[in-house]
Curated annotation (Swiss-Prot):
It comes from the Bacteria. Signal peptide: none annotated. CDD domains: GT_MraY (cd06852). This is Phospho-N-acetylmuramoyl-pentapeptide-transferase.
Length: 365
């Protein structure tokens, strides 16, 4: 909304047009806005969650150090999502259908995560929303969204899979392959980030890094000058540049949330945050046609999810034998004696390295 205000004011005050005409300025402003909103609302929300006794449930078979986390306020993801939506409504171009799609993803997956958390933490339902019901909701939405994105993106012929570190290698995709790939990316990312969110600050830093990386790609690919110079396919779809603005909002809010989520965590994001942020990253990767770059930058999430799949598979197929001491894999390292902070920081370092590798693919082609 503010871009329309500044556009009107620029007729009377010289210089204000930068806030409406330059997406780079809006990227900076939305990141600052989302950061400040999250910082401002963080303490009141934590206090409210404490009064409502909406606290973390800790597994009895987990690391003993986690027992101190019991009853730590949860569902802090509402803070992140609210900040992102408010910031986008303030600084986003509201004529962009891609921005509205991302906001819809936040609302839909946020509702699933919120209901799951509500069942577990408020109604004390031990398992929350049943896995099959959760997967069904995610799947229906992801398939419908994938079909919509196919028709939106295909208007400008942007239906090829970009291969990292290659100047001209693209794999064309029809609607079936596109929808299947998008389905697995969106659902897989949503659940992988959810599994990663098990230690203080562990998930939010990789989320911010991946969002920043995808935002950089979105900015390059929707700028004809940069895209041509760096030999990327120019994504000229009207409104697609707002993806970079949305990514900046996620980064700002995520960094501010880390202020409260760092060890010892004062609040956890819960399923309402992790499921939604994972889904959003997957949708963004599909929008900017950088699914493989997303795989590289988000490889930490992939490893966390694979560790759970391997653990479950081994337990069922090998008569109760496990590969890891506990899954997801971050708990395995805890049970090996690594302090929680060391696990988290080392995983952050890995995520930073993956982020830099993903950025290197911009120029190393």
């Amino acid at each position: 909304m503010l871009i329309y205000l500044f556009e009107w004011l620029s007729h009377y005050f010289k210089g204000l047009e930068v806030f409406s005409s330059y997406i780079s300025v809006r990227i900076i402003m939305i990141s600052i806005t989302s950061l400040l909103i999250t910082l401002a609302l963080g303490r009141p929300m934590i206090s409210w969650l404490q009064r409502m006794q909406i606290g973390q449930i800790v597994r009895d078979d987990g690391p003993q150090s986690h027992f101190s986390k019991r009853n730590t306020p949860t569902m802090g993801g509402v803070l992140i999502l609210s900040s992102v939506i408010i910031s986008c409504l303030l600084w986003g171009d509201l004529t962009s259908i891609y921005l509205w799609i991302l906001i819809l993803v936040v609302i839909f997956f946020g509702a699933i995560g919120f209901f799951d958390d509500y069942l577990k933490l408020v109604l004390k339902h031990p398992k929350g929303l049943r896995a099959k019901h959760k997967f069904a909701l995610q799947s229906i939405f992801s398939i419908v969204l994938a079909i919509v994105l196919f028709y939106l993106l295909s208007k400008n012929g942007q239906m090829s899979l970009s291969i990292p570190f290659s100047k001209s290698l693209y794999i064309p995709m029809g609607i079936v392959i596109f929808v299947v790939l998008a389905f697995f990316i969106i659902n897989g990312s949503s659940n992988a980030v959810n599994l990663t969110d098990g230690l203080d600050g562990l998930a939010i830093v990789p989320v911010v890094l991946v969002a920043a990386g995808l935002g950089i790609y979105a900015y390059i690919e929707t700028n004809s000058t940069l895209a041509n110079y760096l030999l990327f396919n120019y994504l000229g779809n009207p409104g697609l540049a707002e993806v970079a603005v949305f990514c900046a909002a996620v980064c700002g809010s995520g960094l501010a949330f880390l202020w409260f989520n760092s060890h010892p965590a004062e609040v956890f994001m819960g399923d309402v945050g992790s499921l939604t942020l994972g889904a959003v990253l997957g949708v963004i990767a599909v929008m900017v046609r950088q699914e493989l770059i997303f795989f590289i930058m988000g490889l930490l999430f992939v490893v966390e999810a694979l560790s759970v799949m391997l653990q479950v598979g081994s337990y069922k197929l090998r008569n109760g034998k496990r590969i890891f001491r506990m899954a997801p894999i971050h708990h395995h390292f805890e049970l090996k004696g690594w302090p929680e902070t060391k696990v988290v920081i080392r995983f952050w370092i890995i995520s930073l390295i993956l982020f830099l590798i993903g950025l290197a693919a911009i120029k190393v082609r």
